[in-house]
């Protein structure tokens, strides 16, 4: 079954970097439902623990209502060209499913797009960074490297969660993911 997932959000930042709480979870679950999507990936910068704690909290207090995939967004400096730095959203799939990696907002920071091993997807649409994504080039790169094309909100506030999403089978994420280190 395909799910509508916004796999690029910054919920910790949206709530001013406070610890996860039932009140925050209630607001996020309500936003997810109001946008007609099935779930989100939490990809705050350099903090995977917040998303993991948040997922546990949602599962405890709102079981079965939405999908939460914890992760983080990190910078990558390719060995081939350290000046072609880019950002990757790593999602830590539940139940030992491994790590699913998406190349975020291609063209930001560097206009050069280098695809390294263990990149599984690339954003073709990003609500806040769309202005520099060269969609034709991204589609071609995705085809060349067998990458999934993703759309994400890159929400840094509650109201933007779900403004972009990708319809995807969870099994497809699991099939491409690499084992967690």
What annotation goes with each model-predicted range?
Residues 67-79:
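A short, structured active-site edge motif that brings together acidic residues
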Residues 1-7, 11-21, 30, 52, ...:
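Charged catalytic cores and adjacent phosphate/nucleic-acid-binding surfaces used
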Residues 1-3, 36-39, 64-68, 99, ...:
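Short, well-ordered coil/turn segments that N-cap beta-strands
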Residues 28-46:
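Divalent metal-dependent hydrolysis catalytic cores, especially in the metallo-beta-lactamase
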Residues 55-63, 67:
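Short, electropositive alpha-helical surface patch
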Residues 43-45, 104-106, 153:
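Short His-Asn-centered micro-motif
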């Amino acid at each position: 079954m395909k799910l509508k997932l916004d796999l690029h959000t910054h919920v910790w930042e949206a709530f001013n970097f406070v610890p996860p709480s039932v009140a925050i979870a209630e607001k996020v679950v309500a936003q997810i439902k109001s946008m007609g999507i099935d779930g989100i990936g939490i990809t705050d910068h350099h903090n995977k623990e917040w998303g993991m704690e948040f997922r546990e909290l949602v599962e405890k207090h709102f079981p079965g209502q939405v999908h939460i995939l914890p992760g983080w967004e990190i910078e990558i400096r390719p060995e081939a060209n350290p000046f072609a730095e880019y950002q990757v959203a790593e999602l830590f799939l539940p139940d030992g499913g491994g790590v699913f990696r998406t190349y975020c907002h291609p063209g930001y920071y560097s206009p050069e797009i280098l695809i390294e091993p263990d990149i599984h997807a690339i954003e073709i649409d990003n609500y806040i960074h769309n202005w520099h994504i060269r969609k034709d080039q991204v589609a071609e790169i995705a085809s060349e490297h067998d990458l999934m094309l993703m759309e994400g909100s890159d929400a840094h506030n509650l109201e933007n969660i779900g403004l972009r999403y990708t319809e995807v089978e969870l099994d497809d994420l699991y099939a491409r993911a690499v084992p967690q280190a």
